[in-house]
Amino acid sequence: VCDFSVQAANGLVLVRGGGGRGKTSLMCVLAGELAADAGQLQVGGVWLYEQPEAYRQQVFWAETRSAAHDALTCGDYLAKVQRHYPAFDEARLHRAIEGLSLAPHLDKNIFMLSTGSKRKLYLAAAFSCGAALTLLDTPFAALDKVSIRFALSLLAEAEQNRDKLWVLADYAQP
C-alpha cells in the first residue's frame, strides 16, 4: 500500500479488493501489528507511536489464521477479551453466542474448531468488546447463512451507532 491516507468518521467502512491487494496488511497496520513506512495512527485521541498499549486497547483485531489463542477454550478466550476491553458488553456477548450458535463450543479449545466456528468466535468477541475501532477481515468466509444474516444485522446496528468505527475488509460488498 503506497501513499495511502485516510481519516474516517465513525460508523462502518468497507475496504474492498481482490486477493493479494493489501486488505489484511492494511488491517495489520491499523491494529498496530505492522509498522507503516510513514504516517501516524490515532484512535480516540491516543497515538500509536506515543502509547502503543493504550492504542491497542482501543482496537479489536483477531487474525483468524493465527494460532496465538488456539490452546485456550472459547470461553477462556472470551474472558480474556472481556478483561482487555473496559467497554466490553456482556449482554451483547450472550446475544452473539446465541445468534452465532456458539454455546456448544464454549468449552472446546480453539484449535478444535472448524474455520467457520473459529470465525464465529472472533465475531462474537468483536461485537461485544466495545472497542473504538473494530477491524473485520473477510468476516463472512466459511460462515453458514444463518450466521451471515445475524452478523449482517449486527453490522447494520454498528453502522447506525456513530460512536465507534468498524472497518470491514472483503472481496465484495456484503
Where are these regions (language model features)?
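Hydrophobic anchor residue at the start of the ABC signature
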Residues: 123
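Conserved ABC ATPase signature
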Residues: 109-118
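Helix-to-loop junction immediately C-terminal to a conserved catalytic motif
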Residues: 31
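Conserved ABC transporter NBD signature motif
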Residues: 39-50, 54-55
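ABC-family nucleotide-binding domains
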Residues: 137, 143-144, 148
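Q-loop/switch helix immediately C-terminal to the Walker
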Residues: 65, 70-86, 92
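Conserved ABC ATPase "signature" region
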Residues: 90-105
